Amino acid sequence: MAAQGFLLIATFLLVLMVLARPLGSGLARLINDIPLPGTTGVERVLFSALGVSDREMNWKQYLSAILGLNILGLAVLFFMLLGQHYLPLNPQQLPGLSWDLALNTAVSFVTNTNWQSYSGETTLSYFSQMAGLTVQNFLSAASGIAVIFALIRAFTRQSMSTLGNAWVDLLRITLWVLAPVALLIALFFIQQGALQNFLPYQAVTTIEGSQQLLPMGPVASQEAIKMLGTNGGGFFNANSSHPFENPTALTNFVQMLAIFLIPTALCFAFGEVAGDRRQGRMLLWAMSVIFVICTGVVMWAEVQGNPHLLALGADSSINMEGKESRFGVLVSSLFAVVTTAASCGAVIAMHDSFTALGGMVPMWLMQIGEVVFGGVGSGLYGMMLFVLLAVFIAGLMIGRTPEYLGKKIDVREMKLTALAILVTPTLVLMGAALAMMTDAGRSAMLNPGPHGFSEVLYAVSSAANNNGSAFAGLSANSPFWNCLLALCMFVGRFGVIIPVMAIAGSLVSKKSQPASSGTLPTHGPLFVGLLIGTVLLVGALTFIPALALGPVAEYLS
């Protein structure tokens, strides 16, 4: 079993790196504001038709464009969900959503979280899924990538005030990266058996002779961008464990690759744009080491079996409860780590049914900010915050002003870095405390004791870090939970983007200093270890008390 797990992880990472390298080169061209071959004419026509100016923006203008687009998208999606019974492509005549569920869902998809307090096949029309959720899957992913584009430019430009043009970046990212790759993935899913139609739900007679209603819909087109954009919201309630979304072992492997593809490519692009590919490889090494260790822990925990069943004398050599039986415990464990290391949240196994340690690792990966590959754009700019913190700590140890890529890291950058890093832990801990202090929060818990607290902690961690997966034992479709999680999702997304853009605005105006004998190399194994240690230290100091009350207490009981 250990050899199979190692082979699975190694194969996954090898294929991922092979696919991400050329995509990274394409992204580097976009960051450097070089149009891709054959796209100049199309861009000129589109920019003219849309009235888009290619004039560069400072960080405040860039940020305003990103925020304005997302707030407008939130309002449109909110009212679309409220009035979906008036809109077309609703063959099941599904009613509009309640205000709190519509708000939660709109915030969820605009922030790239895709937390779902509803069952897709019984709640949303085809129009809402297509024109509402799928559109936001593209826009939220493009917004995250645009932010990291601006931050990378801040490190590589000198004595400037501009970071590019947000509208140009958003259009290029959507047209030349997300749309074509998602189209290829969608066509592959259709070929493998995923649904893509507009038929009404089909009544069929099962083998036992009973009647069953099978949901239909344009699934493959949403499934592709759901994974590629690290969105994660399923067309159906079972998410990627539903055979209409994820029909074969091959589509399952492609889904995992799609989740990590752009985050990995962005690391390659960063090294290329910075003029030192070792910088990108350093980030990939740090992410990969944490990823492999976490995957190994989850696989080991699930292969050991369920201790509670063993105590009752039942055969539980492997914990298959809640796992995707088509793919097995190892693939289910790998998928769980992939989806929580990134900000995806799609699932093929019920994380609530994992063992205490097996469920703690995905929760912890979210709590550290999903910086292990992470979401499209958000993962890399989250990791860059830890890079700045690691550089600052190293500067304190050697008594020099910290610098990264020749840019000196001053008090302003460190204050903004600390603010950005503290946003999500504050939301998680305060949100979990509020839920446990109120009847409305506690009443949603299915299980008592440590596991019940783990359900609450996981939900708030997922929302604040824009993941969207859940310990499904929590009944979250209530006004209290819909509003609490909507607040966590919104602040967790834009409360980090705002200081990141402010950091970019500060760095882009600085000159790059040549490296000296006292400069800390940021591309070698020493800095990789320092960066990993910084991530682990911040995660340990922040969340060990909360984890001790939940999964650790459950494991020891």
From Swiss-Prot:
It comes from Escherichia coli O6:H1 (strain CFT073 / ATCC 700928 / UPEC). The lineage of its organism: Bacteria, Pseudomonadati, Pseudomonadota, Gammaproteobacteria, Enterobacterales. Keywords: Cell inner membrane, Cell membrane, Ion transport, Membrane, Potassium, Potassium transport, Transmembrane, Transmembrane helix, Transport. InterPro entries: KdpA (IPR004623). Part of the high-affinity ATP-driven potassium transport (or Kdp) system, which catalyzes the hydrolysis of ATP coupled with the electrogenic transport of potassium into the cytoplasm. This subunit binds the periplasmic potassium ions and delivers the ions to the membrane domain of KdpB through an intramembrane tunnel. The keyword Transmembrane applies. Belongs to the KdpA family. Coiled coil: none annotated. This is Potassium-transporting ATPase potassium-binding subunit. The keyword Coiled coil does not apply. The system is composed of three essential subunits: KdpA, KdpB and KdpC. The chain crosses the membrane at residues 5-25, 63-83, 132-152, 170-190, 253-273, 283-303, 329-349, 356-376, 379-399, 416-436, 484-504, 526-546. Its main location: membrane. GO terms for cellular component: plasma membrane. Pfam families: KdpA. It comes from the Bacteria. GO terms for molecular function: P-type potassium transmembrane transporter activity; potassium ion binding. It is a multi-pass membrane protein. It is found in: Cell inner membrane. HAMAP family: KdpA.
